[in-house]
Amino acid sequence: MQSGTVDGLYHEVHGGPASDRQTVILSAGLGGSGTFWAPQMQALMSRFRVVLYDHRGTGRSARTLTDPHTVAAMGDDIVKLMDALGLERAHVVGHAAGGNAGLALALNHPDRLDKLVVVNGWSRPDPHIKRCFDTRLALLNDTGIAAYVHAQPLFLYPADWLSANNARLEAEEVHHINGFPSPDVMRTRIQALLEFDIDEDLETIRCPVLVSASADDMLVPLSCSRRLAERLPNATLDIAPWGGHGFTVTAPEAFNAAVLNFLSGEAA
């Protein structure tokens, strides 16, 4: 594994030279940390060179944001990372905010993208998503970082999985609090997501897209993924029956298989 920081973006490269294998770039959700993808690494590394990174303002990356900070800027950061690594093209797998960044990349830099996987993403503001983000912001603003972090599993995971894995979640909570971005960074990232709207441009995105969603996601309605799949010209919709917003964590085996099949050209 090689790691480094370019233009403020911490990243890791897992696998051999780009000449030996195709490269997959993993882009996390609102939290921004590349460690989110731990349940996917072994499966993806069996066939691909894997690059993960921490979003700007989060994790081990620079804690300052671009101004203005938009989802398009998040997509531009992927291009900056590719440029630094000498990658002309790559596959991108993105969860929620990271999936939206992938859509922005596909729209603004189509020549840099091979295939895109959008996990629990959306193309326009949604009332349910806004209500969830408003609630998270109220927790952050009114009660602080610890309360915000403590509440996150309620948005991410099914209730039965949360109950069964509570000890694990409590152990992770201290780490998440210690590594939390500044409240201003989190507010700005949420605002960028609430303003993201490329709905009228979806038909211009021509690359193959796997739209991956969980039927019981309580943060992003399934209708958002259905809309993406209906309006993107070259999209495939894959719906997990269970797993919540973070089904990449709660049900990784089926997700990993679907992504590998899609990226390898084996999807039906």
From Swiss-Prot:
Matching Gene3D superfamilies: alpha/beta hydrolase
Entry's EC annotation: 3.5.1.-
Pfam families attached to this UniProt entry: Abhydrolase_1
Disulphide bond pairs: none
Keywords, comma-separated and alphabetical: Hydrolase
PANTHER family xrefs: MONOACYLGLYCEROL LIPASE, MONOACYLGLYCEROL LIPASE ABHD6
One record GO biological process: acylglycerol catabolic process
Catalytic activity: carbamate + 2 H(+) = NH4(+) + CO2
InterPro entries named among the record's database cross-references: AB_hydrolase_1, AB_hydrolase_fold, AB_hydrolase_sf, Pyrimidine_utilisation_RutD
Domain AB hydrolase-1: 24-243
Domain of life, per lineage: Bacteria
GO cellular component, one term: membrane
SUPFAM superfamilies reported in the protein's UniProt record: alpha/beta-Hydrolases
Top-level class of the enzyme under EC nomenclature: hydrolase
Name assigned to this protein: Putative carbamate hydrolase RutD
Family affiliation: Belongs to the AB hydrolase superfamily. Hydrolase RutD family.
Annotated function: Involved in pyrimidine catabolism. May facilitate the hydrolysis of carbamate, a reaction that can also occur spontaneously.
GO molecular-function term, one example from the UniProt record: monoacylglycerol lipase activity
Coiled-coil ranges from the UniProt annotation: none
